[in-house]
Design a protein with these regions (language model features):
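Single conserved hydrophobic/aromatic residue that forms the stacking wall/gate
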Residues: 1-8, 12
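Active-site loop-to-helix junction immediately N-terminal to the catalytic Tyr of the SDR YXXXK motif
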Residues: 51-59, 71
Length: 153
């Protein structure tokens, strides 16, 4: 497929993924400051680390989420606000059916992972729970890759 085959799709993804993260952070920080701190967990994507063909606009927008997470983590750390992200791999869900890369026969996606099964939404819970509890009070600006071993950094 040609690069940016849909300009509207590119703009939408940037607005939702990058601008949405920035806007949400700006909206919640005042309340967190009043409470003496807080935790923000953004949702990035493992695609940023392996750049799948045909998804450049999506991958770039999720790369922006990772960059914003790092910057916001540095900017807000001294205010006791931790900003981190989770970067999931392709997750089997109703929303993914019919999208690029979703393979109901569980072919290439599973084969490229160290953990040989499809990822399901529940696989994100442990990472999310860690990032919202006091266990992660000294962690900020980080992105946890929850991709079943597809990408190792």
């Amino acid at each position: 497929p040609p690069l940016y085959s849909s300009a509207a799709s590119d703009v939408y993804k940037r607005q939702v993924n990058a601008r949405g993260v920035h806007t949400m952070t700006r909206a919640v920080v005042p309340a967190m400051l009043r409470k003496g701190g807080g935790k923000i967990v953004n949702i990035a994507s493992g695609t940023f680390y392996y750049g799948p063909p045909g998804l450049s606009h999506y991958t770039a927008s999720k790369g922006a989420v990772i960059a914003l997470t790092r910057c916001h983590g540095r900017e807000l750390g001294d205010k006791n606000i931790q900003v981190n992200a989770i970067a999931p791999g392709l997750t089997e869900s109703e929303g993914m059916q019919g999208h690029t890369g979703f393979d109901p026969a569980r072919g290439p996606t599973v084969a490229s992972r160290s953990i040989k099964r499809e990822m399901v939404p529940e696989d994100l819970l442990g990472s999310l729970m860690y990032l919202i509890t006091p266990d992660s009070d000294f962690v900020t600006g980080q992105t946890l890759n929850v991709v079943g071993g597809k990408v190792n950094l």
